[in-house]
Amino acid sequence: MKLSEKINKKTIIYPLGASSKEDALHELLDYFQSLDYLTATTKLFSYLSSKDKIFNSVASRGVAYHYHTSIEVNDTLAVLGISKKGIDYNATDGLFCHFILLILEPMNSPNSHRKLINLFQELIKNPTIKSNLLELDSSNEVEKIIIDWENSDNSFDIL
């Protein structure tokens, strides 16, 4: 799997308009719904919010990850929101999150999010790429950085 197969100009919200963790989650879920991947978002928001209270979303180094299974999806889907100002996720390192990744996976593949998170972490661990992503003007430019990274020697595929 290549990162650009899941995160591309169609699935990137740039800039993310949310100013809180809850608003970010709503915005990402609503975006999935606008792409006709979901018919409604209320239950998923409730599940993700309650899961977050128990496990706390993975958030550090300016990145937050949400993931859940859904009966409405047949393939692993992702939407990436990028916030220039950052959002307080109560991260253990105290940093605001600028990159919020929401992954929905089918019921029969409850661990497929791990592959996608690993790929995204490989991209974002490059400090130049990370800072460049916050300076762009559109989701098209974000997609170009992802594709350029994939075409470089620094990326890898995960089966």
Regions found by a protein language model. Name each.
Residues M1-L159:
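Cytosolic covalent-transfer regions centered on His/Cys nucleophiles
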